[in-house]
Every structure is written in structure tokens, then in C-alpha cells.
Amino acid sequence: MKDKQFAIPKATAKRLSLYYRIFKRFHAEKIERANSKQIAEAIGIDSATVRRDFSYFGELGRRGFGYDVKKLMTFFADLLNDNSITNVMLVGIGNMGHALLHYRFHERNKMKIIMAFDLDDHPEVGTQTPDGIPIYGISQIKDKIKDADVKTAILTVPSVKSQEVANLLVDAGVKGILSFSPVHLHLPKDVVVQYVDLTSELQTLLYFMRKED
């Protein structure tokens, strides 16, 4: 399954982990079958969106029969490569970086931060987190990435440094970056970037709250 490639819209791709989480929850609750309405209500979208999303993957269920929970849980696990551990690195150990270092990704999904980086003169460089994650100076980044064969990075550096550090990551062989900076990164087309802009998300939330008043 994991070798098969599906051409799907970006909006659908962003919901894949939600579907996987819901089917894992249904499975834990001993639910064997679920229809599109149940799935939609659990996620907070409409059932037509669920059916449209699933249509990109061929025949996942049958009308009037619903979806086999265990089968779909396995399907999305394969699709998201959640059957094996993905090692991740983190760059920038400020407040956000520290919070992410203490978040136990591997207990919830098959992702694990195995090392972190900051400026060479940062006081925590050369130490480890309570969970044993080593913290290195940025000058070591190329050698450490090569040794660990890490292709995915979380970027939590100040906006003014994000492009510079992203360039370092790409030069070292990183192919995927989750950036917490609002600055758009200009990188090669074969590097995948996802942005998490907490300020923008909060402003959007406040906008919809005002609309409800």
C-alpha cells in the first residue's frame, strides 16, 4: 500500500491524519463499521466532504454498508507511513522549541525528535533534555544530520533567521520542514514545507468569534 501514489488535493491531504485518528479511536471503542455521517461528525466536517476525500483512493467502502474501521485504520496507517518510526530534528530551542521537545510525539504517533540544534554559544548546547535528546551547536548540523540520516526538521527559529537556517537544512539533505515562522521560505521544489502560523490561526479564530456576536 505505501508504494502506491495517489494524486489528491492539498485540502484532502491535510485531513488524512484526522481520518487516521478517528479510525484509531473507533477501533479502540470496538466500533467495527462507520458511515460517512459518523466520520464527518467526529471530525467536524460534512459527510459529502468525507465521501469526496475517500473517492480519491478508490473503493474504500460500499453504499449502505459503511466503512470497515480496522481496514481503514490500516489503510491510513500505511498511507501516512505510521508503521515505522520517523526520526525528526528540531532547530531553535526557545520557548516553542522547548515545548515541542517535551511533547512525546512517539507516544501518539510514530514520530520522534532525536536531536536539537541552536546557536553554538547557547548555554544548553552540549547538554541533553530530560528525555535524553542531545542538543548540538548549529555548526554541527551537517555532520549530525548525515550520521543520523534525518530528512525531516521542525524549525522554531526567529523569523529573521528562518531562511538562513532553512538553507542550511536543505544543504545538509533535509527534504521536509515544518516551520513555525510566518516567513515564506524560498527552497528547491523537491523540499516540502508546511507552515504553522499561530498568530494567523488566532486572528482567524477571533474573526469568526466576532462574526457570531
Curated annotation (Swiss-Prot):
One of its GO terms (biological process) is response to redox state. It comes from the Bacteria. InterPro entries: CoA-bd, NAD(P)-bd_dom_sf, Rex_DNA-bd_C_dom, Tscrpt_rep_Rex, WH-like_DNA-bd_sf, WH_DNA-bd_sf. Residues 18-57 bind DNA. It is found in: Cytoplasm. Keywords: Cytoplasm, DNA-binding, NAD, Repressor, Transcription, Transcription regulation. Pfam families: CoA_binding, Put_DNA-bind_N. One of its GO terms (cellular component) is cytoplasm. NAD(+) binds at G92, I93, G94, N95, M96, G97. Signal peptide: none annotated. Gene3D superfamilies: NAD(P)-binding Rossmann-like Domain (3.40.50.720), Winged helix-like DNA-binding domain superfamily/Winged helix DNA-binding domain (1.10.10.10). One of its GO terms (molecular function) is DNA binding. The keyword Hydrolase does not apply. Belongs to the transcriptional regulatory Rex family. Homodimer. Modulates transcription in response to changes in cellular NADH/NAD(+) redox state. Binds to the promoter of the aldehyde-alcohol dehydrogenase adhE gene. Functions as a redox-dependent repressor of adhE expression. This is Redox-sensing transcriptional repressor Rex. It comes from Streptococcus pneumoniae serotype 4 (strain ATCC BAA-334 / TIGR4).
